[in-house]
A protein has these predicted regions:
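Extracytoplasmic low-complexity segments
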Residues: 19-67, 191, 195-196
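Short hydrophobic/aromatic patches on beta-strands that form ligand-binding or substrate-lining surfaces
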Residues: 25-27, 81-93, 99, 146-148, ...
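Glycan-recognition/cleft segments
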Residues: 97-121
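Short tryptophan-centered beta-strand motifs in secreted/extracellular beta-sheet-rich domains
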Residues: 142-151, 155
Length: 196
C-alpha cells in the first residue's frame, strides 16, 4: 500500500453562494479541523494512531494517502467552488481524489489524479463512477492550487482554467458532503474499503 498517492493539504476553502461567504480551514491553531469562523468542523478519518500534520504551503498541512486518511463535512447552501493546496509525493496506484462534493441524491464531482499524474474530473451518479481527462499532468513534489469551480463547470490548476468535455448534471441544492483526500467511489475487497 506504500505506492498510494500521498497528498498534502495545506489550506481548503469552500465558497458558498447562498451566504456570499467563504469557509476556510488552515490546520493551524488549537483545533485544526475547525473552520476559521468556528462554525464548521471537518471529520477526520484515519487508520493511523495520530494524523500527520506537516509543514504546508502556508502553516500546517495534513498528510493523506488517498484511501486511509481523509476528511469530510456536511454543508448547507449553494456551493459555488472548492479550492485547496495539494502536493503529491508519489502518483497513486489507482485513481485518487484531491477533493470533491456530493449532493444527497448521490451525484458527485471530484478533482482526481491517476497513476500517471493525469488530472481527471471524477463524476458519480446512481452508483456508477467515471472519469474525464482534463488533458494536463501534475508534477510530484510541487504545490498545486486546485479549484473545482461548480458555477463555471471547470477546474483551475495554478490559475489555469481547464474545461471538461463532460460534466455531471447539476448538483441539487441543499445539504452536500464535501470530501478531501478521497473520492466518492466505493471499491471494496471483502469488507474493507480500498478506494484509492
Amino acid at each position: 500500500m506504500k505506492h498510494f498517492a500521498y497528498s498534502i493539504l495545506g489550506c481548503l476553502l469552500l465558497s458558498l453562494n447562498a451566504a456570499f461567504a467563504q469557509k476556510t480551514w488552515s490546520f493551524d491553531g488549537q483545533d485544526p479541523l475547525l473552520s476559521s469562523d468556528g462554525k464548521s468542523l471537518l471529520n477526520l478519518y484515519t487508520i493511523k494512531e495520530i494524523p500527520e500534520f506537516v509543514t504546508g504551503v502556508e502553516g500546517k498541512a495534513l498528510r493523506t494517502d488517498g484511501y486511509s486518511t481523509w476528511m469530510d463535512t456536511t454543508t448547507e447552501g449553494d456551493v459555488s467552488s472548492l479550492s485547496g493546496w495539494f502536493a503529491l509525493e508519489s502518483y497513486p496506484t489507482d485513481t485518487a481524489a484531491f477533493m470533491g462534493i456530493r449532493d444527497m441524491a448521490g451525484t458527485s464531482v471530484a478533482v482526481c489524479v491517476d497513476r500517471y499524474g493525469e488530472l481527471l474530473l471524477g463524476m458519480g451518479q446512481n452508483g456508477s463512477y467515471s472519469y474525464c481527462s482534463l488533458k494536463t499532468k501534475v508534477d510530484r513534489f510541487k504545490w498545486l492550487h486546485v479549484v473545482l469551480d461548480l458555477s463555471n463547470e471547470s477546474v483551475c490548476l495554478n490559475g489555469q482554467r481547464m474545461s471538461a468535455e463532460v460534466w455531471p448534471r447539476n448538483l441539487q441544492d441543499g445539504e452536500m458532503i464535501l470530501r478531501v483526500g478521497k473520492d466518492f467511489r466505493e471499491k471494496k475487497v471483502w469488507m474493507y474499503d480500498v478506494t484509492a
